[in-house]
């Protein structure tokens, strides 16, 4: 089986923002109404805003709430069945687990799609998120979004999560 390279050491590789393209899932068709098995890797977070206050605990809490909400929204949509990934005692993440290993773990767990991403706070008011999903059957990227959101508040994070959940829910996957 060919190895697929998935791109996310985005946090620390800022040029991706310049190269980012907004791929659409236009070529995919949703066949039937069966829920698609989806594994979600915990997103990474990076803050290079240079703000003097240490906001790590606040950001980790907001990221945890974001991850909980996206899992809840996607499972609640009826389009996805969440598949748990096991990476030992720690949650699976792009920073701690090689991408090929994550793909294999997701396949072994029975997932059809693997969703992963990261959020980067680049200034006091601007954050961006790079979020991708791979179809593990076709080995194609079916969701690839780079989005910015203004503010570092609970509302800003909720709006960003709701947008991503809506975009993922609109995704169609061939059976």
Regions found by a protein language model. Give the residues of each.
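N-terminal secretory signal peptides that target proteins for export/translocation
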Residues: 1-8
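Bacterial N-terminal signal peptides
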Residues: 11-25
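Boundary at the C-terminal end of the N-terminal hydrophobic targeting segment
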Residues: 22-25, 29-34
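C-terminal/domain-edge helix-coil "capping" segments
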Residues: 31-48, 68, 73-77, 103-108, ...
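Short, well-ordered secondary-structure micro-motifs
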Residues: 50-52, 95, 127
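Glycine- and acidic-residue-enriched helix-capping/strand-helix junction motifs
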Residues: 52-65
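Residue-level preference for nonpolar/small residues embedded in alpha-helices
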Residues: 66-67, 98
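Short, solvent-exposed, polar/charged sequence segments at loop or secondary-structure edges
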Residues: 75-116
């Amino acid at each position: 089986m060919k190895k697929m390279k998935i791109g996310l050491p985005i946090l620390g590789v800022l040029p991706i923002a310049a190269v980012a393209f907004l791929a659409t899932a236009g070529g995919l068709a949703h066949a039937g109404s069966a829920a698609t098995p989806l594994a979600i890797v915990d997103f990474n977070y990076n803050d290079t805003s240079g703000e003097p206050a240490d906001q790590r605990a606040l950001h980790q809490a907001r990221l945890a709430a974001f991850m909980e909400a996206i899992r809840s929204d996607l499972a609640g949509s009826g389009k996805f069945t969440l598949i748990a990934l096991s990476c030992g005692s720690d949650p699976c993440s792009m920073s701690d687990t090689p991408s090929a290993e994550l793909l294999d773990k997701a396949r072994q767990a029975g997932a059809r799609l693997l969703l992963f991403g990261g959020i980067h706070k680049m200034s006091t008011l601007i954050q961006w998120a790079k979020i991708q999903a791979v179809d593990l059957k076709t080995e194609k990227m079916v969701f690839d979004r780079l989005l910015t959101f203004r503010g570092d508040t609970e509302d800003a994070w909720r709006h960003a999560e709701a947008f991503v959940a809506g975009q993922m829910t609109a995704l169609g996957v061939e059976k």
